[in-house]
A protein has these predicted regions:
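Predominantly flavin-linked oxidoreductase catalytic cores and closely associated redox partners
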Residues: 1-87
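Exposed alpha-helical structural elements
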Residues: 4, 73-74, 83-87, 163-167, ...
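Short coil/turn segments at secondary-structure boundaries
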Residues: 19-21, 89-92, 181-188
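FAD/FMN-dependent oxidoreductases across multiple families
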Residues: 37-40, 50, 63-147, 151, ...
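Short secondary-structure transition/capping segments
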Residues: 47-51, 55-62, 130-139, 175, ...
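C-terminal segments that line or cap access tunnels to active or ligand-binding sites in enzymes
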Residues: 52-56, 137, 156, 160, ...
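Active-site-proximal substrate-binding core of FAD-dependent oxidoreductases
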Residues: 128, 143, 147-199
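C-terminal auxiliary extensions adjacent to catalytic cores
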Residues: 189-249
Length: 249
């Protein structure tokens, strides 16, 4: 379970198009990873709308309990980041809210998600899927809702609303939602590995610093640079992250 904090900021359409290099009613969706919640799991997002921006962070509750920084302060720090600050300058806050986001995937789904006259959809069904590259929330909720609608229509037509679970389970398993849930069922555990938020950012930072160093010595060959920092940051742990990613993503 994660906590999402979102703020909606007002900005003229022309300014949005200029800052995000958009035209012809295009939109942009930016996802951020790294030290959003210090060196603990967490991410952030910035979406463009017609005349507003949607900006926020999403951090697992386990990260928030370990972090010494309040959740609201994490959002403030994210907004002040040099990569984000120019994109949201001269905006006005219109909305501010928080929401618990279930990102556990397939293994967090309730065993019984329908019954006598009731069924679960959306967050209650745990239909949000974090693929590690994108977060599929709204589209998967709509896909689950379509399966729910098909179930209710069939139950009403046959006058059998007593036990919806067998039919709903059948419709969910036939939907895109089930395919996506199965495909990325191990990703939630993969994203909890601390290396993604601690070791990998430090590795990339060290390599970039040495690669662009303008000191009095020539820059070492790239392969030598990579090998040096890979060993220094723990080659086998990094290799484990890569192997798991190739297996699960």
């Amino acid at each position: 379970m994660a906590l999402g904090i979102k703020e909606v900021l007002s900005l003229e359409t022309s300014a949005i198009e200029e800052r995000f290099h958009l035209e012809n009613n295009e939109g942009a969706a930016l996802l951020f990873s790294g030290r959003i919640c210090d060196d603990l799991p967490g991410g952030a997002f910035l979406y463009t709308n017609q005349q507003t921006l949607s900006l926020g962070i999403v951090c697992p509750l386990s990260s928030l309990t370990q972090s010494r920084v309040p959740a609201s302060e994490l959002l403030t720090r994210f907004k002040a980041h040099p990569a984000v600050r120019p994109l949201i300058k001269n905006t006005e806050s219109l909305e501010y809210g928080a929401h618990l986001v279930p990102e556990g995937g397939l293994h967090s789904m309730p065993v019984q998600y329908a019954g006598n006259g009731w069924l679960l959809v959306g967050d209650a069904l745990r239909s949000c899927v974090n693929t590690g590259i994108s977060v599929r929330g709204m589209d998967m909720a709509l896909t689950g809702a379509q399966a729910a609608a098909q179930t209710l229509i069939s139950a009403c037509q046959h006058r059998e609303p007593q036990n919806l679970f067998p039919l709903y389970h059948h419709n969910v398993e036939r939907s895109l939602l089930w395919d996506v849930l199965q495909r990325y069922q191990h990703v939630p555990a993969l994203l909890q590995r601390p290396g993604w938020y601690r070791t990998w950012p430090a590795l990339m930072q060290d390599i970039s610093r040495d690669l662009w160093d303008q000191g009095d010595k020539p820059v070492p060959p790239l392969r030598q640079l990579f090998w040096h920092h890979l060993r220094r940051h723990g080659l086998w742990h990094l290799a484990g992250d890569v192997i798991r990613s190739l297996r699960y993503l």
